[in-house]
Amino acid sequence: MKKPSKFKPIGGAVTALLDPLLAKRSHVDAALALSWPELCGERMAGRTQPLKVTWPRRSGPDDPFEPGVLVIACEGAAALDLQYGTSELIERINGFFGYSAIGRIRIEQKRVD
């Protein structure tokens, strides 16, 4: 007969701890996608698409918040325009959220659907 283990699986506990933290960051991705034409302008919105926000690693809960990097898909011809307007776009995005959510933009040249 098998003895019952004193150990419990940690998967459920880890998920319960991480879900609220991830939800705070994922709202940025969803809000960006929904408001993209307003943030970057109709002309640029047709040639670009926000892909994801990557967040810097934190070594502990006491580390200060650091803004993320917004990865944007951009068609080749529009990349120069986007790069030129990067600082203004970061200001608009951070103004939209009310805090410094984005610190940098990384452009990936690819087809936008």
Name each model feature, range by range:
Residues M1-D113:
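Contiguous, often N-terminal, cationic amphipathic patches that form binding interfaces
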